[in-house]
Amino acid sequence: MSLPATFDLTPEDAQLLLAANTHLGARNVQVHQEPYVFNARPDGVHVINVGKTWEKLVLAARIIAAIPNPEDVVAISSRTYGQRAVLKFAAHTGATPIAGRFTPGSFTNYITRSFKEPRLVIVTDPRSDAQAIKEASYVNIPVIALTDLDSPSEYVDVAIPCNNRGKHSIGLIWYLLAREVLRLRGALTDRTQPWSIMPDLYFYRNPEEIEQQTAEEAAQEAGEEEAKEEVTEEQTEAAEWAQENADNVEW
């Protein structure tokens, strides 16, 4: 699939994809994923063609941008590494996020409180989000999926070949997808200028690490305050001592 020149993969984006290990696939390869294989390493890990990944990502972005109401797009991730990325994608593009467990019947049972009638579904992993894909097939909703080389492709209309197990890879794909959607909608008019949002915002962060970092920062601030108080006390004592000596000299 040949893309217009404006959609070509830039060296900066290629470096991001490689740095996030998006090109590292699985050891096993499904038949439908064979066209996306670039090579195989000696340890058995298959390398994904980053050019194919970019082509499918742009195709998915064009499909998303063609839907008039952004809320009709549902972004799903039951995988932990993709939940933050899905929420950020929805915040930037206006899509409807489902982060966490997908409630069965959300697309088929209109009695449930979580019932939705989307026009497009995007999932992070066809295995983890199999229930959502299955229900989408029942009601003829097209599905875009982030697929690894060993991921099943049944009922998936557009597969974006990538490493859908790494937290950096998942976050970067959602980031690039959101950026391309905004560019196609006209929100980001200048393609030569980078997006003000950094990819790190889409990466998964461990809550325990965040709490530990917050505690360390609080301890550091407390230590700095104690040091300032000690310095202030020493300065006060020195000033009092100097005043006493001055009084004695005058006497």
Swiss-Prot record:
Biased composition (Low complexity): 238-251
GO terms for cellular component: cytosolic small ribosomal subunit
Entry keywords, A to Z: Acetylation, Cytoplasm, Ribonucleoprotein, Ribosomal protein
Major site of localization recorded for this protein: cytoplasm
Localization of this protein: Cytoplasm
Keyword Lipid biosynthesis: no
Annotated segments matching region Disordered: 209-251
GO molecular function: structural constituent of ribosome
SUPFAM superfamilies: Ribosomal protein S2 (SSF52313)
Keyword Nucleotide-binding among UniProt keywords: no
InterPro entries attached to this UniProt entry: Ribosomal_uS2, Ribosomal_uS2_CS, Ribosomal_uS2_euk, Ribosomal_uS2_euk/arc, Ribosomal_uS2_flav_dom_sf
Biological process terms in GO annotation: ribosomal small subunit assembly; translation
CDD domains (alphabetical): RPS2 (cd01425)
Location of N-acetylserine modifications: 2
Biased composition (Acidic residues): 218-237
Domain of life: Eukaryota
UniProt record similarity statement: Belongs to the universal ribosomal protein uS2 family.
NCBIfam families to which the protein is assigned, alphabetical: uS2_euk_arch
Known function: Required for the assembly and/or stability of the 40S ribosomal subunit. Required for the processing of the 20S rRNA-precursor to mature 18S rRNA in a late step of the maturation of 40S ribosomal subunits.
PANTHER family recorded: 40S RIBOSOMAL PROTEIN SA (PTHR11489)
Subunit organization: Component of the small ribosomal subunit. Mature ribosomes consist of a small (40S) and a large (60S) subunit. The 40S subunit contains about 33 different proteins and 1 molecule of RNA (18S). The 60S subunit contains about 49 different proteins and 3 molecules of RNA (25S, 5.8S and 5S). Interacts with RPS21.
Official protein name in the record: Small ribosomal subunit protein uS2
Biological source species: Candida glabrata (strain ATCC 2001 / BCRC 20586 / JCM 3761 / NBRC 0622 / NRRL Y-65 / CBS 138) (Yeast)
